[in-house]
Design a protein with these regions (language model features):
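Solvent-exposed alpha-helical segments and adjacent loops
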Residues: 1-220
């Protein structure tokens, strides 16, 4: 990422009401409850920006966080951007829709998957929300991608999993040099000068993600 602007992380934000516990400065054991409107971020979407920001700092890059709900196309046209999260981030869905690997779901939004345009109708990388909620143990899938987005003429980086644990695993993959070296077994030698999209899979056990594995790669 060579642009001079701070690199934006576009991350999903959720508005809602919550109860906040406030403690007395003179007596921290004394507390009161306050109901307030909050903007919250999914905890699974937090670790990737933290890890990637560490890499950016090594290369002397600055960054900023943009809430998905208020991010505009004008802002994204200023330079490369990083998009965190899938079904809670409309920009991720919008930018990945034309790609070979993209996110999809059934009308009831109970099943979510990554679809391959080369094999339409095949739902190999699918997650059933019912299974996820009942057991906490399931296979999860994610997309990691880097490409020139035609809407902005800038590089877009996607770090997005279907459900809890997926986005975190994608972020782990992106900052792990050993895992990035695995890409060389799946791509041509000049892949670093091309657009690339990777499908990852990870085993979730009791809500915790295992190591990410490469399921498919597309370079163009």
């Amino acid at each position: 990422m060579n642009a001079g602007e701070p690199v934006p992380f576009c991350i999903a934000d959720q508005n809602g009401y919550s109860t906040i516990k406030l403690r007395d400065a003179a007596d921290p054991q004394h507390e009161t409850l306050l109901t307030d409107s909050l903007v919250t971020v999914n905890i699974d979407d937090v670790s990737p920006p933290i890890n990637i920001a560490g890499l950016l700092r090594i290369y002397g890059k600055t960054y900023r966080v943009l809430p998905e709900a208020t991010t505009s196309l004008t802002e994204l046209r200023r330079g490369p951007s990083i998009f965190i999260g899938a079904f809670d981030n409309s920009w991720t869905l919008r930018l990945t829709t034309p790609l070979r690997f993209h996110f999809a779901n059934n009308p009831d939004m109970t099943q979510f998957w990554i679809e391959d345009r080369a094999q339409l109708g095949k739902q190999e990388w699918m997650l059933d929300r019912g299974v996820q909620q009942r057991t906490g143990t399931y296979k999860n899938y994610a997309i990691v991608a880097r490409f020139i987005d035609p809407n902005t003429d800038q590089f877009a980086v996607i770090v997005a999993g279907i459900a809890r644990g997926g986005t975190g695993a994608a972020g782990e993959f992106l900052v792990d040099a050993n895992r990035l070296n695995e890409i060389a077994n799946h791509v041509p030698k000049d892949w670093n000068r091309k657009n690339i999209e990777i499908v990852l899979e990870t085993q979730i056990i009791e809500g915790r993600s295992g190591p990410p594995r490469i399921a498919a790669v597309h370079v163009w």
